[in-house]
Amino acid sequence: MSLLRKKNVDQMIAGAQRAGLKKALGAVDLTFLGIGAIIGTGIFVLTGTGAVQAGPALMVSFIVAAIACGLSALAYAEFASTIPVAGSIYTYSYAALGELVAWIIGWDLMLEYSLAASAVSVGWSGYAQSLLKGFGVVLPTVLTAAPNSVPGVTTYFDLPAFVVMMAITTLLSVGIRESTRVNNLMVFIKVAVVLLVIAVGVFHVTPANWTPFMPHGWSGVFGAAAVMFFAFIGFDAVSSAAEEVKNPKRDLPIGIIASLGVCAVLYVTVAAVATGIVPSSQYAGITHPISYALQVAGQNWVAGFIDLGAVLGMLTVILVMTYGQTRITYAMSRDGLLPAVLSRVHPRFQTPFLATWIIGLLCALIAALIPLNVLAELINIGTLAAFSMVSIAVIVLRRTRPDLPRAFRCPGVPVVPVLAVAACVFLMLNLSAVTWKAFGIWLVIGLVIYFVYSRRNAKIAQGGAQH
């Protein structure tokens, strides 16, 4: 049995066309879907972490992270327009690079989606607590954060993060999916909050706070960029909607690139305002840096709106990431790479009920017990590895299937995909040794599962659907 057996691209596309899903999404819907998935903990919470690490040069860190993401986004856009099939990077790699690589990427995606849902839950917790304090409700300190996450403060369990994660799991398990209209409304709220920060904050910027601009040198800038990469994760969620798009070959690339571009501009501007209002070193240990900056500026009413907007806006990110995790698990189980029980559908709710609850409970415990900075780095290394693979896959599919119609072509192949791989690997090298060790352990576990179970049980081995 070949480790590189592939799914047939033509059969995949034909199967997607027979699926009968309602094709209702356009370019604007996809752009909003992307922005909805991107804007979350990265900007509302990790801005403080990045500011401590890079200083005012956090603006440069965002640009570096955006370039790395943008190069990968071009590769994503080509795949999304060529193979408009649900499943995103896992499906693309199964067609272009073969089963073993698809397994590794799927295993990486499971890490990305589950930890991203947990990380956003932690971010949500910080803003929810800040909002509750405005109404005089204060939780016991030991239940406000994961152990060792707040310097000098004894904490054991992040209760709000656990509760919100379980609430989202309950909704998903009974089949409540966010509609495009609700998602667009939440995106509007999040973008409005970010614009409010910029509009009010710009009048309270003290240029002296931008000096020194790069207090920790380029190592601080690149280290922060490796963490802030998390702020852009989510544009890949656009491609998972491929089978429900009216004109996927045109609209998917627009949705991917437009959502990333809008968020990059907003992030750099917010970083400039936040580090201009508060000296970057003062963000250490702050779990709600954006509203904190406005509180320092004396704009408590604006800070309250930011807390509310962040709480509402991050709910959609938790939902999208948790749903994405259940979808990738379901797809891999359906392909035979994971046990069939994980793709079993509830007879009443028509959802992968057991898989949703297993994933939800694990994510809730992770959110309650692991500090945010640790989660962010682990998410980033898995995602950067997966993005590198999709860039390589573009080059491979160009050579192996030059006949496939490509509505969008990644420019400068193979140079641009090679640059994307180089940028992703460079950011990976700026992550901590502990993160690399944890990622290595995760990969080893995944490979053991593949060789012991998945390789023998893969549906493709039974059906011989190779190209």
What is each stretch, according to the model?
Residues 14-21, 58-59, 63, 137-163, ...:
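Helix-loop-helix junctions that connect adjacent transmembrane segments
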Residues 22, 27, 156-162, 246-250, ...:
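Loop-to-transmembrane helix boundary motifs in multi-pass membrane proteins
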Residues 21, 153-157, 168, 215, ...:
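C-terminal membrane-solvent junction of multi-pass transporters and transport-like membrane proteins
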Residues 1-46, 52-57, 70-74, 83-86, ...:
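Membrane-interface "cap" regions at the ends of multi-pass membrane proteins
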Residues 22, 45-150, 259-262, 269, ...:
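Extracellular loop-to-transmembrane helix junctions
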Residues 130, 193-197, 329, 379-406, ...:
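Hydrophobic alpha-helical segments of multi-pass membrane transport proteins
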